Amino acid sequence: MSVISTLRDRATTTPSDEAFVFMDYDTKTGDQIDRMTWSQLYSRVTAVSAYLISYGRHADRRRTAAISAPQGLDYVAGFLGALCAGWAPVPLPEPLGSLRDKRTGLAVLDCAADVVLTTSQAETRVRATIATHGASVTTPVIALDTLDEPSGDNCDLDSQLSDWSSYLQYTSGSTANPRGVVLSMRNVTENVDQIIRNYFRHEGGAPRLPSSVVSWLPLYHDMGLMVGLFIPLFVGCPVILTSPEAFIRKPARWMQLLAKHQAPFSAAPNFAFDLAVAKTSEEDMAGLDLGHVNTIINGAEQVQPNTITKFLRRFRPYNLMPAAVKPSYGMAEAVVYLATTKAGSPPTSTEFDADSLARGHAELSTFETERATRLIRYHSDDKEPLLRIVDPDSNIELGPGRIGEIWIHGKNVSTGYHNADDALNRDKFQASIREASAGTPRSPWLRTGDLGFIVGDEFYIVGRMKDLIIQDGVNHYPDDIETTVKEFTGGRVAAFSVSDDGVEHLVIAAEVRTEHGPDKVTIMDFSTIKRLVVSALSKLHGLHVTDFLLVPPGALPKTTSGKISRAACAKQYGANKLQRVATFP
């Protein structure tokens, strides 16, 4: 069934069941809750659809509706309403006066949006953003909360059943060149099926599905859209949404919502697990229990084994089951999901000899190993999405334990980027494997840009190809370096290289607090921190640090999904725009 036919079925068979709930914290009048049943949601969706259908059709292309609105139920109605009208929705961030506003404006321009859907609250900012960053000032901007309820059903169900039915998911990387991944409804339904098969333990032949979903992830992000919209829609359970800002202001809210709802499914990036551990008090959790939690995905950025260990230890007194926490791997080019740990099993990790990893092959650490790297263990089988390790230069499939690029094959994989050069899309999305193993299709394969290796039915991720740091001919993975630095600084870290006359130099930038208090440092500590970090990187990694910066909290540039952007850090460093809290001799 398509997304919209599933929604209409829910509105018909369970019209009064709660569908979407939005928790709006910290408003001027206190916390507020906005609720919609399935029938109410369908009415809102058809109101949006009726308005868009009134614009008519383009003869040669599908109309696009960019959505740039605050997190909430209007965002949900806007996305589904565009699909319902046979349009292509384009989920984007709400303009908030930050660097990401440029990305939003450029995306509106790139997708040639016929309209921009927003709310009355954000309308002025949206108009200013699209005018400033090159989109036509005549592009209609529609406040979703002002649309009248329609009479009759205004959904174009025929368009939902064709491969033409699609949306654009802009990746969270480059601000200067946002890329819209073209995703069909077939891609989505395949990925939902893959998620159900791989995340939920099967009992008696049926998956143990969640009874609710809890999400604070932004709906414009690939994981936020899957967890906050597609999963509850296809599973048929209520979703409790809140905003990323509400989580950041009080991370304990995430755990409290999980405790208060039945068998919940949820997801967040690795940094959120660290925040939940650091910022959730005993008072916050008083009287609460997490023993009923179905699944918590850790994804969207490199999963750190230490984070998983600390998270499980912190919430063990509240009966959180280790098997409920699921380290995961995915990307927007494949909707979102690619792999996770084995269903029903707790997350595990393995220690490898770091020197062998630097030389391009994996060897287990032993008592003689001088330096070990611990990596999360993911499960790999012969079901889609298929995963293989390939030499990125020769396109030859690599054997067990050899480090190469991770390639993906499956019906959830996009056909390419919108408005991209044909050669780029062929190289990225239609790659062919040479000397493929038995049972391995020759093509098409998605080049992920990630490095990893396979051992048996397990695979491991070591980092991004573009972030690889090479010093004295040896490969070093920034995640490994950053983990070492965090042991001394406590905050977020970026390890990146800069080139000077063809020579690569390692730079470390670490966020620290300067006030007194737990996990904070004083000015007198800075030189000590630098000495310890430089010494550790030399002894443990064999690395020479050219420059070491301590910067204020929040100073390191991030992508729209909250990940540290090493490329942006390097660019700001080169322009001398990274703010330092201390200068070292």
From Swiss-Prot:
Its EC number is 6.2.1.-. Pfam families: AMP-binding, AMP-dom_DIP2-like. Keywords: ATP-binding, Fatty acid metabolism, Ligase, Lipid metabolism, Nucleotide-binding. InterPro entries: AMP-bd_C, AMP-bd_C_sf, AMP-dep_synth/lig_dom, ANL_N_sf, FAAL/FAAC. Gene3D superfamilies: 3.30.300.30, N-terminal domain of ligase-like (3.40.50.12780). SUPFAM superfamilies: Acetyl-CoA synthetase-like (SSF56801). One of its GO terms (biological process) is fatty acid biosynthetic process. GO terms for molecular function: adenylyltransferase activity; ATP binding; ligase activity. This is Probable long-chain-fatty-acid--AMP ligase FadD30. It comes from Mycobacterium bovis (strain ATCC BAA-935 / AF2122/97).
